[in-house]
Amino acid sequence: MKVFGNPNQKKQELKNLIKNLTLDERYLFKKKDFRKEILKNIDKNMTLLDVGKSMRDYFDEIVCVEKKTLDINIFENYPDFQFDLSEDIEIEKTELNEKFDVIIYLAVLEHVYNPFVAIKNLRKMLKNNGIIYGYVPFLYHYHAPEDLYFQDYYRFSKDGLAYLFREFHNLKLYPVRGRLSSSMHILFGSIWKRTFEKYNLNPILDGFFSKDKILNKQVGLTL
């Protein structure tokens, strides 16, 4: 048998990446609006970038020294920076280099055609000891619009996130839907959200059906 490279060493490195992340399974059974949770952790002295203006209605509630938006597309009232995160450019030569204390990207990364380059770019925009808050799907339906104004490329497992964010430290995952909630959301979509999720019934049901399977993830990371 011929061995090329050092596959055994790489296998161990990958295992260590996964073992070193934190998965807070208890979060699954605590129905919370994670946008509100993020809002509580933003200090008025921070600089902040919201990719895709993904804080939605909470964006206007953010109080900090400076808050900016970034998007590949142009909408009526944003972004401040039009930027293709998948484009490998020299961030170091732009005003975005190490500019932000906090970067938020919620339900954005699945729409980025090269998430590896995107995360590298976001890391360069982040100050030392800054934090990234994100939300990514694992089991979720295809949701690009018919006109493909934005596209839908990827889904992310725990192992995939560990590798994607391998240059960060203090990687923490918080599941927001379990086995039952994810299945029902795929099958019934907005009906499920307007009923069970609106009245916070899904954490109770997930408690019975989802303890061994964590599906959708919210992810918070610190550089």
Q: Which residues are covered by each model-predicted region?
A:
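Conserved SAM-binding loop
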Residues: 37-145, 150, 158-162
